[in-house]
């Protein structure tokens, strides 16, 4: 779990402290700059955690070092080493991130990673902070940094991707392919700007493609839909209907050809078992629906129709659906009995 932690944000501080005192199995992490006040606040907030982690970060790209931090690379290197060592004395483990890694020089990133590992970092995170990389570029970047810094093989390599180009999940999965043991993601993909990699999409992809990725998680995916709804309600961020895995339409089949196939065998148009993510498959009725789905809806409503009655009712339904789009199932009963 990742939270911003600094004294200038009392709400974040209390949030971290509350989570740390409540959860039992997960490692609780607080995010901190390479600033002693941040590090002290993070350690204090994590005091009640069963297992605590401070996540230290500093930018390594030229534009960030020059324009945002006003620091020379040598000073960035010094701060990274010092902050990790300081944090390692106060919590169970330390994670270190090179902010804006994908726009950084791989050789410099390797040097900073080596310094962080030598100072005590157990997890090293190489973020695509602005969603700049393509999947093959991100995988290649991680592999190149690890080639230049063999010490990375002694720690957990982590991926953190943003969705500015809609590639956060693809990039995260590409990272898993080249050995990332941790992927940072969020429920519903919420996050800065266009968001972060979507937890539900990554979890289900790794579950379905376990042999392909040779990786697995301990996520209980049957609770994913409930978690998505809870996060949506608490944040006010509406989940788009066509969102993969958790969108309202993710397991809804309206097209007649698809509905016919689904009624015969759900594997025809569905690669994810809805029960695996805590939802049900639906066959909504609309102008693209076919006779088989309509007949199924009538049967589900307890109506017993002769072939002629079914044909007449289906014609009335299609006329209604052609003008109104989706047709609630209760309206089918009205149309049939009219």
List each model region and its residues.
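Alpha/beta enzyme core
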Residues: 14-23, 36-157, 173-180
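Flexible glycine/proline-rich, aromatic-decorated loop/lid segments
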Residues: 50-51, 167-183, 190-208, 250-273
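A mid-to-C-terminal "edge-of-domain" accessory segment
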Residues: 204, 210-338
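Structural signal for hydrophobic packing residues in well-ordered secondary-structure cores
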Residues: 20-27, 46, 50, 54, ...
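Metal-centered catalytic cores of metalloenzymes
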Residues: 136, 143-149, 173-174, 193-204, ...
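Histidine-centered catalytic micro-motifs
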Residues: 157-164, 171, 185
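Short, ordered loop/turn segments at secondary-structure junctions
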Residues: 5-8, 31-34, 58-61, 99-101, ...
């Amino acid at each position: 779990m990742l939270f911003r932690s600094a004294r200038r944000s009392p709400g974040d501080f209390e949030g971290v402290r509350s989570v740390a005192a409540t959860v039992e199995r997960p490692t609780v992490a607080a995010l901190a700059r390479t600033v002693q006040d941040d590090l002290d606040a993070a350690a204090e907030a994590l005091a009640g955690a069963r297992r605590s982690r401070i996540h230290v970060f500093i930018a390594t790209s030229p534009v960030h070092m020059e324009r945002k931090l006003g620091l020379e690379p040598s000073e960035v290197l010094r701060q990274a080493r010092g902050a990790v060592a300081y944090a390692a004395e106060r919590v169970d483990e330390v994670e270190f991130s090179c902010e804006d890694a994908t726009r950084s020089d791989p050789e410099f990133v390797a040097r900073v990673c080596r310094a962080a590992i030598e100072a005590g970092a157990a997890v090293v995170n190489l973020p695509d902070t602005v969603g700049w990389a393509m999947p093959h570029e991100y995988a290649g970047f991680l592999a190149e940094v690890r080639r230049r810094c063999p010490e990375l093989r002694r720690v957990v390599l982590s991926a953190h991707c943003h969705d500015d180009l809609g590639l956060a999940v693809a990039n995260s999965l590409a990272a898993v392919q080249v050995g990332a043991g941790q992927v940072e993601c969020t429920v519903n993909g919420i996050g800065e700007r266009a968001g972060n990699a979507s937890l539900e999409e990554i979890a289900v992809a790794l579950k379905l493609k376990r042999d392909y990725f040779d990786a697995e998680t301990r996520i209980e995916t049957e609770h994913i839909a409930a978690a998505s709804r809870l996060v949506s309600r608490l944040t006010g961020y509406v989940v788009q209907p066509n969102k993969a895995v958790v969108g309202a339409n993710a397991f809804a089949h309206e097209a007649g050809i698809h509905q016919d196939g689904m009624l015969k065998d759900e594997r025809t148009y569905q690669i994810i078992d809805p029960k695996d993510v805590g939802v049900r498959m639906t066959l909504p009725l609309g102008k693209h629906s076919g006779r088989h789905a309509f007949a199924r809806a009538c049967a589900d409503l307890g109506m017993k129709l002769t072939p002629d009655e079914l044909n007449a009712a289906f014609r009335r339904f299609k006329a209604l659906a052609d003008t109104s789009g989706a047709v609630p199932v209760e309206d089918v009963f009205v149309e049939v009995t009219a």
